[in-house]
A protein has these predicted regions:
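Metal-dependent amide/peptide-bond hydrolase catalytic core
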Residues: 1-135
């Protein structure tokens, strides 16, 4: 198995084309290879709308004394499907933890309620903003 990650559709097309070339040009006589995509996640790329959503989340956290900084991890998440549909989304705003998807994964338990509160307040601010702009 090969885990291929890409930032956008152009990168995907290029990488898949190059892998296909490798599969076609076998170097051992009597052998063949093929590329079989077993699963795929869409990349999560920032949009102005998702940046605005993240800014609201960061403002909420900051109002409670927590500084949140964004990063692009290059990982795979369901949020990529949401973004691909054109819906603003933020990812990785759950509890504080580390060593994700490994046997030694951990979570700072007291951060779970804190991050849930941040998200609830973010949703509340979005609702207030929507109400104010629709009047």
């Amino acid at each position: 198995d090969i885990d291929i990650r890409y930032r956008d559709d152009a990168d995907r097309a290029y990488i898949f084309e190059e892998v296909e070339k490798i599969c076609i040009n076998t170097s051992v006589e009597g052998t063949s290879s093929e590329m079989l995509v077993k699963g795929e996640f869409h990349p999560l790329n920032p949009t102005p709308q998702s940046a605005e959503l993240f800014d609201i989340y960061c403002d909420v956290a900051k109002s409670e004394g927590v500084n949140i900084e964004g990063e692009h991890s290059g990982g795979c998440a369901d949020s990529g499907f949401i973004a691909a549909a054109g819906t603003p989304v933020i990812c990785g705003v759950g509890p504080v933890g580390g060593n994700y998807h490994r046997p030694d994964e951990w979570m700072q338990v007291d951060s779970l309620s804190e991050r849930a509160r941040f998200m609830a307040k973010t949703i509340q601010k979005l609702a207030e903003k929507t109400t104010a702009t629709s009047l």
